[in-house]
């Protein structure tokens, strides 16, 4: 991906985040890193990878979230964004692509 695409999202609780696509090769590497020996993605690893490589503003880590639901909402939206999967929760709270 020559121009790393960004997207602004707004969570259900009103917090705004900027996501940035890290490139196709990095997405493939992330997908490999987050799986356990049985090929099942680890929630903790997915969150760590999304927060390290995709959520660019504000920079966050797992410990910054007060609720599991809020943390997973951001991580899931980031994962949907980089993999090109439609967000099943997509509604008027999502920002527009930039």
What does each model-found stretch correspond to?
Residues 5-14:
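Short acidic-hydrophobic surface loop/beta-edge motif
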């Amino acid at each position: 991906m020559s121009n790393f695409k960004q997207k602004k999202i707004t969570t259900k609780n009103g917090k705004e985040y900027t996501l940035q696509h890290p490139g196709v090769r990095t997405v493939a590497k992330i997908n490999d890193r987050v799986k356990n020996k049985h090929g099942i993605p680890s929630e903790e690893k997915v969150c760590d990878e999304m927060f390290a490589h995709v959520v660019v503003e504000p920079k966050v880590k797992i410990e910054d979230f007060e609720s599991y639901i809020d943390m997973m909402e951001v991580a899931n939206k980031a994962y949907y964004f980089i993999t090109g999967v439609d967000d099943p929760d997509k509604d008027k709270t999502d920002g527009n692509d930039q």
